[in-house]
């Protein structure tokens, strides 16, 4: 007999339309409305990347691809998909409540972030657990999946494909910048989070398995809180690497993200490219995983290892 289970796919969320921008960022800032200047800056950034971030549609596509792959991988389980977002509807709590209404008593949760931190994955899981406890729903959480061979294979392939576009005699003058979303240092230290070590491990695995000679780790998209965040910032890192080594080619792999969205399309493709243009170096940024079978397969393999 086929067992029915929920698959709760959790993500940060993104505005669907321009009128969502203010409530979305108010939620991010714990109820504090952004100023008109901050709001205009955000609207300008979205306009710069061609309109609202494609994240919403990509998140839906990733969730659909994942539930489809899981239902092929498990002959005796039928997974029903639920999407829960942190900062915009459908919220995580809405998704868990809907599970209860549908008679789901057991579910797997997956956050669309490959590395674990209490700030992201941990806080999402906590919100899901608190809501699930009201209904007696048992949740099994995927904590991370960056170590899965298919995840590393995806990025290794992309690095090698990018290197193939660069003349071989320039490979020694090429550096790979591996990055993730920065987080407040105090939070990482207080919770003894493995987040920085997981990014370092990801970079090491990519270096071991790809043809890249030089690699550096950076952080990006930090918030404006007035407190120290993880560094170095990728823009500062780019300048420092150029000053020390005169690299001609910079390849950026924001491996902490899983699709093209504002942080990649603006913070990398605009801000990092501006620095590269300024120092006279070439900017490269391979395609993000999105719904690539290796990426979806990595999450399926992680689920198989815990369930």
Curated annotation (Swiss-Prot):
* GO CC terms of this entry: cytoplasm
- The Enzyme Commission number assigned here is 4.99.1.9
UniProt catalytic activity: Fe-coproporphyrin III + 2 H(+) = coproporphyrin III + Fe(2+)
Which residues are recorded as binding Fe(2+)? 181, 263
Domain of life where this protein originates: Bacteria
Please give the coiled-coil regions recorded for this protein.
none
Concerning Pfam families, the annotation shows: Ferrochelatase
The molecular function terms of the Gene Ontology recorded here are:
ferrochelatase activity; metal ion binding
InterPro entries per record: Ferrochelatase (IPR001015), Ferrochelatase_AS (IPR019772), Ferrochelatase_C (IPR033644), Ferrochelatase_N (IPR033659)
Compartments where located: Cytoplasm
Q: Which UniProt keywords apply?
A: Cytoplasm, Heme biosynthesis, Iron, Lyase, Metal-binding, Porphyrin biosynthesis
Q: In which pathway does it act?
A: Porphyrin-containing compound metabolism; protoheme biosynthesis
- Residues annotated as binding Fe-coproporphyrin III are 12, 29, 45-46, 53, 124
- Gene Ontology biological-process entries: heme biosynthetic process
Spell out the HAMAP family in the cross-references.
Ferrochelatase
What family does this chain come from, according to its entry? Belongs to the ferrochelatase family.
Tell me, what does this protein do in biology? Involved in coproporphyrin-dependent heme b biosynthesis. Catalyzes the insertion of ferrous iron into coproporphyrin III to form Fe-coproporphyrin III.
What PANTHER family does its record include? Answer: FERROCHELATASE, FERROCHELATASE, MITOCHONDRIAL
From the Swiss-Prot or TrEMBL record, give the protein name.
Answer: Coproporphyrin III ferrochelatase
Gene that specifies this protein: cpfC
């Amino acid at each position: 007999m086929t067992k029915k289970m929920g698959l709760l796919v959790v993500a940060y969320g993104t505005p669907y339309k321009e009128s969502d921008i203010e409530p979305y960022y108010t939620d991010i800032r714990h109820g504090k409305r952004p100023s008109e200047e901050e709001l205009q800056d955000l609207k300008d950034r979205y306009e710069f990347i061609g309109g609202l971030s494609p994240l919403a549609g990509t998140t839906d596509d990733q969730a659909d691809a994942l539930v489809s792959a899981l239902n092929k991988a498990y002959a005796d389980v039928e997974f029903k998909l639920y999407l829960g977002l942190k900062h915009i509807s459908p919220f995580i709590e809405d998704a868990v409540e809907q599970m209860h209404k549908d008679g789901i008593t057991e579910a797997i949760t997956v956050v669309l972030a490959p590395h674990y931190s209490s700030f992201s994955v941990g806080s999402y899981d906590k919100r899901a657990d608190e809501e699930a406890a009201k209904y007696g729903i048992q949740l099994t959480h995927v904590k991370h999946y960056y170590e899965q061979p298919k995840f590393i294979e995806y990025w290794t392939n992309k690095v090698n494909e990018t290197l193939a576009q660069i003349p071989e005699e320039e490979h020694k003058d090429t550096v790979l910048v591996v990055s993730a979303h920065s987080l407040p240092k105090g939070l990482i230290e207080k919770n003894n989070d493995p987040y920085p070590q997981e990014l370092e491990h990801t970079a090491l695995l990519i270096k071991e398995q790809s043809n890249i000679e030089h690699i550096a780790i950076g952080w990006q998209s930090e918030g404006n809180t007035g407190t120290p965040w993880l560094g170095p910032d990728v823009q500062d890192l780019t300048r420092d690497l150029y000053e020390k080594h005169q690299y001609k080619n910079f390849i950026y792999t924001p491996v902490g993200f899983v699709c093209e969205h504002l942080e990649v399309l603006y913070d990398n493709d605009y801000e990092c490219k501006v620095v590269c243009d300024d120092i006279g170096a070439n900017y490269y940024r391979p395609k993000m995983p999105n719904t690539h079978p290796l990426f979806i397969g990595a999450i399926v393999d992680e689920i198989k290892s815990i369930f």
